[in-house]
Design a protein with these regions (language model features):
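DNA major-groove recognition helix of helix-turn-helix/homeodomain DNA-binding modules
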Residues: 48-63
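Short basic helix-loop element that most often maps to the first helix and adjoining turn
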Residues: 8-25, 79
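Conserved hydrophobic/aromatic packing and binding residues within compact polymer-binding modules
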Residues: 10, 24-25, 35-38, 64
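Helix-turn-helix DNA-binding elements, focusing on the entry/boundary residues of the two helices
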Residues: 10, 21, 32, 47-50
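A detector for short, charged/polar N-terminal pre-domain segments
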Residues: 1-5, 73-76
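Short, charged recognition helix plus adjacent turn
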Residues: 65-81
Length: 81
């Protein structure tokens, strides 16, 4: 999975916590359009926005980044081999 999984993971946790997209955006201090674009995989959040989102959701960043970090780890080790 690539960077688009960040948005789908954010959406998954938002829905699990029964938070509306508008409420997440407000809590994170972001626009609803920006959060929607992130969730659809159209935009990759900045580090600051990602921190604001995970704090607003009450989750850790690794829960959102698990697919991306795992892929990067495999690529790094294959390049070093």
């Amino acid at each position: 999975m690539g960077l688009e999984s960040i948005g789908s993971n954010i959406r998954k946790f938002r829905l699990m916590k029964k938070i509306r997209q508008e409420d997440l955006a407000e809590k994170a201090g972001l626009s609803t359009n920006y959060v929607g674009a992130i969730e659809r995989g159209e935009k990759v959040p900045s580090l600051e926005a990602l921190i604001d989102i995970v704090n607003a959701l009450g989750i850790s960043a690794d829960m959102v980044l698990c697919d991306v970090v795992h892929t990067g780890y495999e690529v790094r080790h294959s390049l070093l081999a």
